[in-house]
């Protein structure tokens, strides 16, 4: 098993190119199931979750050319309607094949998903919506089985904004009979990207990016060529890296409008953020001010940047309160940060972070994707050597992480244990 070794304490400087967004690429790859013929998608990142999705779609009969960058998918002949546990167990986004399969073929059998162990993330919202669209859905032996001759348009309300649920039902509704309204829909940029792809296929989706999405079902969709948006979470991670190391990084290829909540907090913390054509400059000033964070669905502060921001607050001046409202059990990185000298107390769904000025390198263990990123940032800021184990979590969501940080001047390397 690999681990990452970091010699910290060096300001990071230079340029970093942001990869395509994993959380946009996964549903867009699944959307190919709605069509016959060759879909072409650009800016696909080379990540473990992408490779898992590739295997999953191929197991269903999808022909795929390419592994990253530009890939082509042809779902003209679906030979299997079951997404098996062996493929689904490592990645929750696997549930995204459920809606497209039921919509196009009238049947699907998908194993209950796995992925990061950061809370329940229930699929009941997906199931309830499909049932309201006329599908017969049962849970049997760890699988979701859904059947419908043709899904019917429906007036749907999500009890809470759900990114995966919004995406799944948007895709299902694209081939349904009639109009579907998704109320209290998630508003993330990745949902807007998916809606653009669906409309390119001939779907009639409006309102993506708001909390009410309207989908008028059509009889048939056609293949499309489309681009994946840049990864706002990767961009945010490198922006925070500039702050936590007192560095100066030009973040290329990011979309500023996707980063509003983070930018505001980084400026409050004393960083310099300067937009330019094609990206932004993020620079630390040497002194980090404490800021309070409350995670919220988009356009609020993203839960996927909470752990990284905590690493920065661990070396800030003063006291910060970080409140997690989106997922439960998302403070599993706290114990590892404390091994490096951080002063953090958990009170319910809040973490009270008292800045200590400097962290010390230590052996630490990743518990999930974003927690692992926070430990990398802490290691980059710390004095001495940090060894991060279980780095397969990082490989699920960060493309060429060591290479990109090395290009910014970090002493970081991967070794096999």
From Swiss-Prot:
Any one of the GO BP annotations: regulation of cell shape
Primary residence: cytoplasm
Binding positions (phosphoenolpyruvate): 22-23
UniProt keyword list: Cell cycle, Cell division, Cell shape, Cell wall biogenesis/degradation, Cytoplasm, Peptidoglycan synthesis, Pyruvate, Transferase
Location of this chain's protein in the cell: Cytoplasm
Domain of life: Bacteria
Protein name: UDP-N-acetylglucosamine 1-carboxyvinyltransferase
């Amino acid at each position: 098993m690999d681990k990452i070794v970091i010699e910290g304490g060096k300001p990071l400087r230079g340029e970093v190119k942001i990869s395509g967004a994993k959380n946009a690429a996964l549903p867009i790859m699944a959307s190919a199931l709605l069509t016959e013929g060759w879909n072409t998608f650009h800016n696909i990142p080379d990540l473990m979750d992408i490779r898992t999705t590739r295997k999953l779609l191929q197991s269903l009969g999808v022909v795929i050319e390419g592994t990253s960058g530009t890939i082509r998918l042809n779902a003209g002949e679906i030979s299997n309607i079951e997404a098996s546990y062996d493929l689904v167990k490592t990645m929750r986004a696997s549930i995204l094949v459920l809606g497209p399969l039921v919509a196009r073929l009238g049947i699907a059998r998908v194993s209950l998903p796995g992925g990061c162990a950061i809370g329940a993330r229930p699929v009941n919202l997906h199931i309830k919506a499909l049932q309201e669209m006329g599908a017969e859905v049962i849970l049997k032996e760890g699988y979701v089985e859904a059947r419908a001759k043709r899904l019917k348009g429906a007036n749907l309300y999500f009890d809470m904004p759900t990114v995966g649920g919004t995406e799944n039902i948007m895709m299902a509704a694209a081939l349904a009979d009639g109009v579907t309204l998704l109320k209290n829909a998630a508003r993330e940029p990745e949902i807007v990207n998916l809606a653009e792809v669906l409309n390119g296929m001939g779907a009639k989706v409006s309102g993506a990016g708001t909390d009410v999405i309207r989908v008028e079902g059509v009889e048939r969709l056609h293949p499309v060529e489309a681009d994946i948006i840049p990864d706002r979470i990767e961009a945010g991670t490198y922006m925070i890296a500039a702050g936590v190391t007192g560095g100066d990084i030009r973040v290329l290829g990011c979309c500023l409008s996707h980063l509003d909540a983070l930018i505001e907090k980084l400026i409050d913390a004393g960083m310099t953020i300067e937009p330019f054509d094609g990206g932004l400059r993020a620079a630390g000033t040497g002194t980090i001010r404490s800021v309070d964070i409350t995670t919220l669905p988009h356009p609020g502060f993203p839960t996927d940047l909470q752990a990284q921001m905590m690493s920065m607050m661990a070396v800030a001046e003063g006291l910060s309160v970080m409140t997690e409202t989106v997922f439960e059990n998302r403070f599993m990185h706290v114990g590892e940060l404390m091994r490096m000298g951080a002063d953090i107390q958990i009170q319910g769904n809040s973490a009270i972070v008292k800045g200590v000025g400097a962290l010390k390198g230590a052996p630490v263990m990743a518990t999930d994707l974003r927690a692992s990123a926070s430990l990398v940032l802490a290691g980059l800021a710390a004095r001495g050597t940090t060894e991060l184990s279980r780095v397969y979590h990082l490989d699920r969501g960060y493309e060429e992480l060591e290479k990109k940080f090395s290009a910014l001047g970090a002493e970081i390397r991967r070794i096999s244990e």
